[in-house]
């Protein structure tokens, strides 16, 4: 079953239908579904699909030759081309009169094994593109390699591509499509636990409770995910121990560079380079208060939900998990799940806000959204706003998100109203998001104010999943 990626498929099909030479670059983290996307795209098309392996040039060339032989007739079985140049020239020959897709998956493995691969492709593209019906797709999981050696200005292939796609994990809406039997609340928890990476979503079983899924997948040493974060780091970086320490520090509450450096016992200059690599891998993101330039107020957060959950709960409980004390480990995790879900709920609420905007239903036509934190000059205390976005210098929205089992009280609305006055906007709209609902007092005050939207999680879930209800 293939889910989502409608825009990416539309782009690929548009390129294919041009019937002229096209060169698409597809890249993204491991497990996000790049190969599944390509396989779905070429399933009804003439195509040569070759996946590079982490081996030498000879092995990769033999595998590439085999892929070509499986498509083309007139080549003796067991034949191997003498070089990648000869092999690719042969494929260009096949594309003189027919539309053919050539896919080189895990391209970084091939290019590292064959140092002349990029310049060979450059030469052959320049020579044949004007008279070729080839659609070339280069795909890779090493994002730094693809960005530096395929997409970058100094790369040999720069200027040859006709499209590029960075494949990201699914958002909450598309993640929901994987399941039919989870309740709305359980679906939020599942998204908070594994995020939108297809390979991780497939580990979840909607015939089981969230508790049993956590026990079966995260608290089970035999599961595919149990060592996934550490294994992925080993594949991507040279010093996984330091990266592990950094991610653990962020997951357990250290958010500023100085705090992280102190926590792991390294200097901030050393930490900053590691952090840059983690950002490039899509595992960490740097956040700055909305509307402000990068400053000392910038903080770091884990960008991937599965990594966030794993590093928040597994390392501290690793010893008892390894000894089979699943129930004890879950007993330690369960009381912290509601607090953990707070930031996940903010993320879901922002996705809701973006859909409102795209559907033309947002009361404020913002250009961006983000969190804000800083000092309240009147009370001289640190404060924060969960969601903020502005349309122009006079119009903005502010949001507060509460993942709690009680109805949200009017005091929360009053606090949000007060925080919004830290900024000099003439027109302000307030959003209160609640897991459960709102007290009567909160509902009445929102009605009096007239510039407030009260939105429950159930409404968000129904709206994001196109169940035909009003936005709020």
Which residues make up each language-model segment?
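Phosphate-binding site recognition
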Residues: 1-330
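A cross-kingdom feature that marks ATP-driven nucleic-acid transaction machinery
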Residues: 290, 299-472
